[in-house]
Regions:
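Secretory targeting signals
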Residues: 3, 10-15, 26, 35-89, ...
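C-terminal and late-domain segments of enzyme folds
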Residues: 204-206
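Internal alpha-helical transmembrane segments of multi-pass membrane proteins
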Residues: 175-179
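Short helix-to-coil transition segments within interhelical loops
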Residues: 103-109
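A short amphipathic helical element positioned immediately N-terminal to and/or at the very start
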Residues: 20-32
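Single transmembrane alpha-helix segments in multi-pass membrane proteins
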Residues: 86-98
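Membrane-interface capping segments at transmembrane-helix boundaries
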Residues: 238-247
Length: 247
């Protein structure tokens, strides 16, 4: 009996692994084959290149310039591509047949949501790491501060992707999610002129503090928690909408 029980547990574990593998593969395939994702990646890459060329051209011989000095401005431009990618990834689920395909591969909506979160997180980390790494290499000087700034930038870009995707999944409207993401992420630093110190609780303005080279540790921690809270809230809202939706 014990041998049969062990064999049964092995088969069950293998079955679960296969199901998760299929779900992750399906979600990754959707991300890779969605044309809008590639266009968004091109926008982000172009923004990174143009920003670095502009900054390096504006500094005398580029001497002493590190990525920690560039990160806030760099993020303002590059995050546009990540916003577009996140909204596009979520929008494809309810505006095309991809959503039904996902449910056929993984009928359990909770597991599907986790698989989607894992794939988007991995995609954001890889894409942002490539862009940040190239920009770090383009800077004349590299220091510990620059590496820390690069790491925080990778975190922020991944958060932008997840935040935008969460808004898209929760609102189920490309226009609505795009508008919300633009206000919260892209326009937030400009809104600080009208909102004053209250704007720091918006993710876009919190990111500027998170990436600033001269920000205090307390301010950086507060900004990081603000970004985490917004990202988690958007993802939870999207997951709840997916689990409760009829299709």
């Amino acid at each position: 009996m014990s041998g049969a029980g062990a064999a049964s547990r092995v088969r069950a574990t293998a079955g679960v692994t296969t199901v998760w593998g299929r779900a992750l593969h399906a979600e990754l395939a959707k991300v890779v084959t969605l044309p809008t994702m590639w266009w968004s990646a091109a926008v982000a890459g172009t923004a990174a290149a143009v920003t670095m060329m502009s900054v390096l051209h504006g500094v005398l011989d580029g001497q002493g310039l590190g990525f920690e000095d560039v990160a806030p401005v760099w993020a303002l431009a590059v995050q546009i591509g990540f916003v577009a990618a996140g909204v596009a990834a979520a929008g494809a689920e309810h505006s095309t047949a991809q959503g039904m395909t996902s449910l056929l591969v993984m009928p359990a909506r909770g597991r599907l949501a986790v698989a989607r979160l894992m794939v988007l997180t991995g995609t954001g980390l890889v894409a942002s790491s490539v862009l940040v790494g190239a920009s770090l290499a383009a800077c004349p000087t590299t220091s510990t501060a620059a590496l820390w700034a690069g790491g925080r930038t990778v975190v922020w870009m991944t958060a932008v992707l997840l935040l935008s995707a969460g808004l898209g999944a929760a609102l189920r409207s490309v226009i609505g999610a795009s508008a919300a993401a633009v206000v919260l992420v892209i326009l937030a630093p400009q809104l600080a002129v009208f909102l004053g110190n209250a704007a720091r609780w918006l993710p876009g303005q919190a990111a500027q503090i998170w990436l600033a080279a001269d920000a205090s540790r307390a301010d950086v921690t507060s900004a990081g928690l603000t970004i985490l809270a917004w990202t988690a809230a958007a993802q939870v809202a999207g997951i709840v909408r997916l689990v409760q939706a009829d299709g």
